[in-house]
Amino acid sequence: MTTQAPADVIPFREAVRAWFLISLQTFGGPAGQIAVMQRTLVEEKRWIGQQRFNHALNYCMLLPGPEAQQLAIYVGWLLNGTRGGLVAGTLFVLPGMLALLALSAVYVLWQDTTVVTALFAGIAPAVLAIVSQAVIRVAKRSLTHPLFVAVAVAAFLALALFGAPFPIVIAVAALIGWTVHKLAPHVLKKGNGHGGDGGPAPLIPDDALHHVQPSWRSAGKILAVGLVAWWLPVAAVALLLGTDSVFTTQGLFFSGTALVTFGGAYAVLAFVAQRAVETYAWLTPGEMVRGLALAETTPGPLIMVVQFVAFLGAYRDPGALTPWAGALLGALLTTWVTFVPCFLFIFLGAPHVERLRHNTAISAALTGITAAVVGVIANLALYFAEHTLFARTFTWAWGPFSIQLPEPSTVSPIALVITVAALAMTFVLKWPMLRILGICALLGLATVLLQ
């Protein structure tokens, strides 16, 4: 028997405080960001059940754009309706946007961000520990049958060894889940969905129906409002500053990239780098690398690097505006067209996805995706570990196999020590995340001061 979820599951102010605290911890790319929400929303506050969380994540993994921000919008919508989704999604990117905006200005002025980079270099090992904990916990709760363990391992190997396209990995996992539903439905039987840890039931249990009834009329309204919000700033810039201005070009270009970022930011960054450097000459190859480093060491989605690209491009070609006004406009417009589509995708699709949770065939396909997501997060964790602990990596290839390996001689002793300390604080001392992040950030900064 299902129950009806209320419009506001928790007080709105309490939700805003929680999303603000989560937004300050969104380091380490999607793996780290999903880990933060998993720990905060599912395990600590118990606002949402594990299966419900996985269901939302599965849908977000199918969409273009930053899946972690989309997950925040989805859960915010479940907890507090449309305003909850708007607040959760906005706060998720706001700290990173402001931080990268400030660092972009610092870079333009002094061409140096050494101290800031060192500060965040201490955070990276802490995020590695948090991600490791998330992989273990999500695996324990999601891989309820040896078959799904095999799916997770296969997804990891497909990405790590074969470089398989992310959409194909997800599609195969969904097909496996659907096939299991047809041939061996007993494999899909689940527990109570409360995490199996003996704690209290979540405020949004796994069998609760959302109060919003999907309809084509409401979908049409959402689509109309979303498209106007998305494209109105681009049209205004084109009208006021000209269709050949750098701002119109950036608005159109980054609106397009927002629709093709399947499988995470890395899947589209090569295309962005090529066009931004070679076609538009907004920045140099070295500056693209520096922007990526800054985006990796600030909170928020990695695709935020496009803000840095737009900032430099508009600063150097501001048209009728001053360089600083142009840089600010370019950065804000690019951020807008990159993240507004995420709200549209969630508000448009979530009501329908919620009603499909009790469709056994679709639920089975999403269960297969859940297993694959464990492998995806593990692969992201491996990538993050290699680039946190080592300065350089190389690609080892043999026949169809290809894997990125670290160069042992480039290991960072400081990063290794901070990682061990972070693992101890996470698994042994079980300290809160903010404390771990703060201590590791100070350790990273101390290394620069000592040198």
Regions found by a protein language model. Name each.
Residues M1-L63, Y74-T298, L302-Q451:
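Multi-pass membrane proteins that catalyze or facilitate reactions on polyprenyl-/lipid-phosphate substrates
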Residues Q70:
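Conserved beta-loop-alpha segment that forms the PLP phosphate-binding cup at the N-terminus of a helix
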